[in-house]
From Swiss-Prot:
GO terms for molecular function: metalloendopeptidase activity; RNA endonuclease activity; zinc ion binding. The lineage of its organism: Bacteria, Bacillati, Actinomycetota, Actinomycetes, Propionibacteriales. Residues 64-84 are annotated as: Disordered. It comes from Cutibacterium acnes (strain DSM 16379 / KPA171202) (Propionibacterium acnes). It is found in: Cytoplasm. This is Endoribonuclease YbeY.
Protein backbone atom coordinates (compact mmCIF):
# COMPACT_ATOMS: atom_id res chain seq x y z
CA UNK A 1 0.00 0.00 0.00
CA UNK A 2 1.31 3.42 -0.92
CA UNK A 3 0.09 6.46 0.97
CA UNK A 4 0.85 10.00 -0.16
CA UNK A 5 0.27 13.15 1.87
CA UNK A 6 0.84 16.66 0.56
CA UNK A 7 1.59 18.99 3.46
CA UNK A 8 3.70 21.31 1.31
CA UNK A 9 1.07 23.77 0.14
CA UNK A 10 2.50 23.31 -3.38
CA UNK A 11 0.70 21.59 -6.24
CA UNK A 12 2.17 18.20 -7.06
CA UNK A 13 1.48 15.27 -9.35
CA UNK A 14 0.57 12.96 -6.49
CA UNK A 15 -1.15 10.42 -8.73
CA UNK A 16 1.97 10.22 -10.91
CA UNK A 17 4.23 9.70 -7.89
CA UNK A 18 2.04 6.87 -6.59
CA UNK A 19 2.00 5.31 -10.07
CA UNK A 20 5.78 5.48 -10.29
CA UNK A 21 6.24 4.07 -6.78
CA UNK A 22 3.91 1.18 -7.63
CA UNK A 23 5.79 0.54 -10.88
CA UNK A 24 9.20 0.69 -9.16
CA UNK A 25 8.20 -1.63 -6.32
CA UNK A 26 6.94 -4.15 -8.86
CA UNK A 27 10.12 -3.82 -10.93
CA UNK A 28 12.24 -4.28 -7.80
CA UNK A 29 10.11 -7.32 -6.84
CA UNK A 30 8.89 -5.89 -3.54
CA UNK A 31 5.61 -7.47 -2.42
CA UNK A 32 2.59 -5.29 -3.34
CA UNK A 33 1.30 -5.43 0.25
CA UNK A 34 4.43 -3.62 1.48
CA UNK A 35 3.72 -0.21 2.97
CA UNK A 36 5.31 3.00 1.76
CA UNK A 37 4.53 6.58 2.75
CA UNK A 38 5.39 9.56 0.58
CA UNK A 39 5.16 12.90 2.35
CA UNK A 40 5.48 16.24 0.58
CA UNK A 41 6.54 19.07 2.90
CA UNK A 42 7.37 22.77 2.73
CA UNK A 43 10.91 24.12 2.97
CA UNK A 44 10.65 25.06 6.64
CA UNK A 45 9.63 21.53 7.60
CA UNK A 46 12.28 19.96 5.37
CA UNK A 47 14.93 22.23 6.86
CA UNK A 48 13.91 21.16 10.37
CA UNK A 49 14.03 17.46 9.38
CA UNK A 50 17.37 17.90 7.62
CA UNK A 51 18.92 19.50 10.68
CA UNK A 52 17.31 17.12 13.20
CA UNK A 53 18.01 13.85 11.41
CA UNK A 54 21.09 14.60 9.30
CA UNK A 55 22.71 17.37 11.33
CA UNK A 56 22.91 19.57 8.24
CA UNK A 57 21.61 23.11 7.76
CA UNK A 58 19.09 24.20 5.15
CA UNK A 59 16.38 22.31 3.34
CA UNK A 60 17.17 19.33 1.14
CA UNK A 61 15.26 17.67 -1.68
CA UNK A 62 14.57 14.18 -0.28
CA UNK A 63 14.97 12.25 2.96
CA UNK A 64 14.28 8.57 3.56
CA UNK A 65 13.31 6.97 6.85
CA UNK A 66 13.40 3.15 6.61
CA UNK A 67 11.24 1.02 8.88
CA UNK A 68 11.79 -2.70 8.23
CA UNK A 69 15.17 -3.66 6.84
CA UNK A 70 14.19 -4.77 3.34
CA UNK A 71 16.19 -5.58 0.24
CA UNK A 72 15.11 -6.45 -3.27
CA UNK A 73 15.05 -10.26 -3.54
CA UNK A 74 17.28 -12.41 -5.69
CA UNK A 75 15.81 -14.22 -8.68
CA UNK A 76 15.12 -17.37 -6.66
CA UNK A 77 13.67 -15.61 -3.61
CA UNK A 78 10.10 -14.61 -2.82
CA UNK A 79 9.36 -10.87 -2.76
CA UNK A 80 9.60 -9.46 0.77
CA UNK A 81 6.67 -7.73 2.43
CA UNK A 82 6.71 -5.23 5.26
CA UNK A 83 6.94 -1.58 6.20
CA UNK A 84 9.33 0.09 3.80
CA UNK A 85 9.24 3.48 5.50
CA UNK A 86 8.76 7.13 4.62
CA UNK A 87 10.08 9.21 1.75
CA UNK A 88 9.91 12.95 2.42
CA UNK A 89 10.10 15.25 -0.61
CA UNK A 90 10.20 19.05 -0.75
CA UNK A 91 8.49 20.23 -3.97
CA UNK A 92 9.89 23.78 -3.83
CA UNK A 93 13.49 22.56 -3.53
CA UNK A 94 12.79 19.94 -6.21
CA UNK A 95 11.40 22.57 -8.59
CA UNK A 96 14.42 24.84 -8.06
CA UNK A 97 16.97 22.15 -8.80
CA UNK A 98 15.08 20.57 -11.72
CA UNK A 99 16.54 22.94 -14.31
CA UNK A 100 20.06 22.39 -12.96
CA UNK A 101 19.61 18.67 -13.62
CA UNK A 102 17.97 19.07 -17.03
CA UNK A 103 14.60 17.81 -15.85
CA UNK A 104 11.09 19.15 -15.47
CA UNK A 105 9.87 19.65 -11.90
CA UNK A 106 7.78 16.46 -12.21
CA UNK A 107 10.76 14.61 -13.68
CA UNK A 108 12.97 15.73 -10.81
CA UNK A 109 10.36 14.66 -8.26
CA UNK A 110 10.17 11.25 -9.95
CA UNK A 111 13.95 10.89 -9.93
CA UNK A 112 14.14 11.82 -6.25
CA UNK A 113 11.28 9.49 -5.35
CA UNK A 114 13.23 6.57 -6.80
CA UNK A 115 16.39 7.83 -5.09
CA UNK A 116 14.56 7.81 -1.76
CA UNK A 117 13.07 4.39 -2.43
CA UNK A 118 16.49 2.94 -3.18
CA UNK A 119 17.74 4.31 0.15
CA UNK A 120 14.83 2.55 1.88
CA UNK A 121 16.03 -0.68 0.27
CA UNK A 122 19.55 -0.25 1.61
CA UNK A 123 21.30 1.44 -1.30
CA UNK A 124 23.74 4.23 -0.59
CA UNK A 125 26.13 6.50 -2.43
CA UNK A 126 28.82 7.20 0.15
CA UNK A 127 31.43 5.18 -1.76
CA UNK A 128 32.12 5.51 -5.52
CA UNK A 129 31.18 1.89 -6.27
CA UNK A 130 27.92 2.13 -4.31
CA UNK A 131 27.15 5.42 -6.02
CA UNK A 132 27.57 3.93 -9.50
CA UNK A 133 25.28 1.01 -8.67
CA UNK A 134 22.62 3.17 -7.03
CA UNK A 135 22.54 5.89 -9.68
CA UNK A 136 22.56 3.34 -12.52
CA UNK A 137 19.58 1.56 -10.96
CA UNK A 138 17.84 4.91 -10.44
CA UNK A 139 18.35 5.77 -14.13
CA UNK A 140 17.20 2.30 -15.25
CA UNK A 141 13.95 2.53 -13.29
CA UNK A 142 13.19 6.02 -14.60
CA UNK A 143 13.93 4.92 -18.19
CA UNK A 144 11.67 1.88 -17.79
CA UNK A 145 8.95 4.12 -16.30
CA UNK A 146 9.23 6.50 -19.26
CA UNK A 147 8.99 3.54 -21.67
CA UNK A 148 5.99 2.17 -19.77
CA UNK A 149 4.17 5.51 -19.97
CA UNK A 150 5.00 5.82 -23.65
CA UNK A 151 3.66 2.33 -24.39
CA UNK A 152 0.50 2.85 -22.37
CA UNK A 153 -0.21 6.36 -23.68
CA UNK A 154 0.32 8.02 -20.31
CA UNK A 155 2.78 10.59 -21.59
Amino acid sequence: MIDITNESGSPSNEEGLVGLATFALDRLRIHPSSELSIILVDEETMEAYHEKFMGLPGPTDVLSFPMDEMRAPGDDEDPPSGLLGDIVLCPTVTARQAAENGRTPDGEAEYLLIHGLLHLLGHDHAEPGEKRVMFRLNDEIIAAWDDHREQTGQR
